[in-house]
C-alpha cells in the first residue's frame, strides 16, 4: 500500500498526518477548525484515499499556522506515499460543480512545485476559516509534495461552494494522477526521472 506518515512539531503546531493513496475515502480530521476539517474529509472522500489528520495549533493567535502547517505535512505525506513514482499516470484534471460554483483543478506530479491560484472570495471567513488561507494551504501542499498545481474558479459567488468545489476537484485530480497504469514502464517522462 502506498502510504505516507508525517509528524511535524514546531513551537506553533503539532501535526500527525497519514495518507494512504489506495484507500476508499475514509478520513479522520481534527484540526480545531470545523470548516477546514470538513474540507479535508471532502478531499479524502473524493480522492478515494484514506487519511488521518491530528493537528494542534496556536488557534488563540489565528488559523494561519494550523492551516499552512497542515498543508506542509500533507504535501510531505503525499510525496512519501508516491515513492519512486513508477507507473503513475502523473497528470490529473478535474472539473467540479457545487451549485453555482464551478472549479477546475489540473496538476502534474512533476517534482516541479508551482501554484497558479485564480480565485477571489467575497467574504473574509467561512466558519472559522480565513478564506485567504485557502491559497496558502494549496501552496504548502504543492511545494512540499512537488506538484505543479493550477486552480481556477470558472464561476461562483458563494465562498463555501467555491472552496468545497476546490477541495473535491483537488481530490479527484490527485486520484487520477496517482493511479497506477501497467502500460507505463518506469516513470512517465522522456527524461527517465521526475
Swiss-Prot record:
Cellular localization per UniProt: Cytoplasm
Cellular component annotations (GO), alphabetically ordered: cytoplasm
GO biological process terms, semicolon-separated: L-histidine biosynthetic process
Main localization (coarse): cytoplasm
Reaction catalyzed: D-erythro-1-(imidazol-4-yl)glycerol 3-phosphate = 3-(imidazol-4-yl)-2-oxopropyl phosphate + H2O
CDD domains given in the database record: IGPD (cd07914)
SUPFAM superfamilies in the record: Ribosomal protein S5 domain 2-like
Top-rank taxon, per record: Bacteria
Family: Belongs to the imidazoleglycerol-phosphate dehydratase family.
Protein's recorded name: Imidazoleglycerol-phosphate dehydratase
Organism from which the protein derives: Ruminiclostridium cellulolyticum (strain ATCC 35319 / DSM 5812 / JCM 6584 / H10) (Clostridium cellulolyticum)
Amino acid at each position: 500500500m502506498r502510504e505516507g506518515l508525517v509528524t511535524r512539531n514546531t513551537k506553533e503546531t503539532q501535526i500527525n498526518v497519514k495518507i494512504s493513496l489506495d484507500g476508499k475515502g475514509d478520513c479522520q480530521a481534527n484540526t480545531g477548525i470545523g470548516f477546514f476539517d470538513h474540507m479535508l474529509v471532502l478531499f479524502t472522500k473524493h480522492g478515494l484515499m484514506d487519511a488521518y489528520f491530528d493537528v494542534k495549533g496556536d488557534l488563540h493567535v489565528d488559523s494561519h499556522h494550523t492551516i499552512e502547517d497542515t498543508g506542509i505535512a500533507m504535501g510531505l505525506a503525499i510525496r512519501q506515499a508516491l515513492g519512486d513514482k513508477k507507473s503513475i499516470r502523473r497528470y490529473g484534471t478535474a472539473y467540479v460543480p457545487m451549485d453555482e460554483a464551478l472549479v477546475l483543478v489540473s496538476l502534474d506530479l512533476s517534482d516541479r512545485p508551482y501554484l497558479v491560484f485564480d480565485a477571489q472570495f467575497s467574504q473574509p471567513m467561512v466558519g472559522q476559516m480565513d478564506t485567504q488561507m485557502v491559497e496558502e494551504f494549496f501552496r504548502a501542499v504543492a511545494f512540499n509534495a512537488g506538484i505543479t498545481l493550477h486552480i481556477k474558479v470558472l464561476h461562483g459567488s458563494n465562498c463555501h461552494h467555491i472552496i468545497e468545489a476546490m477541495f473535491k476537484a483537488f481530490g479527484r485530480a490527485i486520484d487520477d494522477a496517482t493511479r497506477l497504469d501497467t502500460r507505463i514502464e518506469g516513470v512517465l517522462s522522456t527524461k527517465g526521472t521526475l
